[in-house]
Amino acid sequence: MAENLAALDDDEAELRAATLRAGLDDYDLDEEDAALLSGEYGDEGDEGPLKLDPVLAIIGRPNVGKSTLVNRILGRREAVVEDTPGVTRDRVMYSARWNGRNFTLVDTGGWEHDAKGIHARVAEQAEMAVELADAVLFVVDSAVGATATDEGVMKMLRKSKKPVIMVANKVDDFAQEADSATLWGLGFGEPYPVSALHGRGVADLLDHVMDTLPEYSLVDGVERSGGPRRIALIGRPNVGKSSLLNKLAGSERVVVDPLAGTTRDPVDEFIELGDRTWRFVDTAGIRRRQHMAQGADFYASLRTQAALEKAEVAVVLLAVDEVLSEQDVRILQLAIESGRALVLAFNKWDLLDDERRRYLEREIEQDLAHVEWAPRVNISAKTGWHKDRLVPALDIALESWDRRIPTGRLNAFLGELVAAHPHPVRGGKQPRILFGTQASSRPPKFVLFTTGFLDPGYRRFITRRLRETFGFEGTPIEVNMRVREKRGKKR
């Protein structure tokens, strides 16, 4: 079949398709059919060079209301908020807008002086956020007043030499504004009294922020051509997502700890791989039973799904030192249902002996047969072994995800397929495929106009042959039917 299609002239293919399309005029078509058949497909081109929005970092000691303030500024619940110190652990970026201006908002974990263990790593992340920011909101609990930890934050901010706006949070009414005056002693000028929980004073604060921020970021102020392709790293907790992101970025971008579920918010990072910029999203591990998850873990699982929806390609990380679980399969299904391109990354492959590798290959063939079309990369998130193989796999998946088949070629393919493998006769009737068109890409979706319903098995057969013939590797594809009858036919 592939040879016959290759030998077919494009003009001849389009002529055949036009003949088949004309034949549809004898059938009852609705407005949606007509729109689909007459619509012209156009891919979005590159947006050209663009400058990065200015960056505003929010910093303070644990549990002063930083994430609550983030949600208030964004006008929606994005940052994970819980009345427990330390819920935000990484520096997390969000796109924000105020009075017609865009800026990037960075939420950070609580900064603590001389912190130990994971808290020390959280503090380092907060300091890195300050380095990459154009201005900083220093949030202090007005009800508590300045503490020794606040003074430690003050010293760190002074060394950074960044513009700092002092925010006195938890000022719920006018009577409490006097408490904020005591914060003058921290040396950053007049504190802005706000209530992040109720929104009091936040508008005035943002007006001042807009006066402080530059038009474009002066820190990372390079121009990027087009928009970087967006990649979601997903997988069950503690599978190595954060370690992989850090290895790719070449820095400790995400807090890594043996404790499962350390990453709670989606974390975006622009990473240079294969001479191009990619936007990676490292997400919290998807929990086993979302409806049973409590507090921060519940909201983090929702954030993970939201990040997947915003991505273009999902890299599903699977640990080869553990048996493939139902949870792994469910996560894969979630990626497929989202319609994103897909790459499978098998972590810790370098630790396997030959016998275990042979066993795992058989296990993959059995348990992952439904995603045999996805490119596979065997890597080590910890050491970076084979990390260079990710880019070719991502390219293959995204090219397939973007691909569009000319209508003439598609109908020539369908004609060859049906001639060689006609649909089985059911109840004395044999449904025919009248015409086919690709309704969209990202992911590729095809619509077949037919005279009757096609068996599920036959539709799977068409899908499989579409993959083989046109090279749809790394993307889910969808084949839908529109059953139509001839005009004037008695029912």
UniProtKB/Swiss-Prot annotation:
Signal peptide: none
Keywords assigned by UniProt, alphabetized: GTP-binding, Nucleotide-binding, Repeat, Ribosome biogenesis
PROSITE patterns assigned to the protein according to its UniProt record, in alphabetical order: G_ENGA (PS51712)
InterPro entries reported for this sequence: AAA+_ATPase, G_ENGA, GTP-bd, GTPase_Der, KH_dom-like, KH_dom-like_a/b, P-loop_NTPase, Small_GTP-bd
Coiled-coil intervals: none
SMART domains, per database record: AAA
Cross-referenced Gene3D superfamilies: 3.30.300.20, P-loop containing nucleotide triphosphate hydrolases (3.40.50.300)
Binding site for GTP 2: 235-242, 282-286, 347-350
Annotated binding of GTP 1, by residue: 60-67, 107-111, 169-172
GO biological process: ribosome biogenesis
One MF term in the entry's GO annotations: GTP binding
Domain KH-like: 403-485
NCBIfam families in UniProt: GTPase_EngA (TIGR03594), PRK03003.1 (NF002828), small_GTP (TIGR00231)
Free-text function comment from the UniProt entry: GTPase that plays an essential role in the late steps of ribosome biogenesis.
Oligomer status and interactors: Associates with the 50S ribosomal subunit.
Name by which UniProt lists this protein: GTPase Der
Native source organism of the sequence: Paenarthrobacter aurescens (strain TC1)
Gene that encodes it: der
